[in-house]
Amino acid sequence: MKEKIRSFFFILGVLFPIVCQAMVATGPNSLVFKSSSVLNSLPSKDVQSVYQDRDGYIWISTRNGLFQYDGYSITTYKSNLYCPDLLTNNNIYCVAEDAQHRLWIGTYSGLNVLDKQTGQIWKIDDPEINGIGISQILVTSDNRILFATEG
């Protein structure tokens, strides 16, 4: 009988802190995540990367274009019937911002730059990287642009 009581208190001593901690974790101070209906409307759910620029905008790189989210609405950047040459490719791997507030865009087949102040996008025309996937971009503290390529 004493053995059963001892076992009961041992189990209670082990389980009680675990149960209390679980109750605290699900209490009123728990984090709650809500999905934005605007973000649910992205044409592509296949997100490659997410980047927040110095102005607070969220840039979402997908296999179907680049999307800028300002907290309320989404602006789309991708080549289409009306702007067939806007980007080297709509499959966007990554983005990074330089000191001049330009956004460097790495795609499946090249590198683009977006001037956020004018909205102008241009392609980096370099035979060494044309047609090659730019998988990562790093802007150094002295504003050098480094990028990793595929292949």
What role is predicted for each listed range?
Residues 1-151:
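Carboxylate-rich, polar loop motifs that coordinate divalent cations or form catalytic acidic clusters
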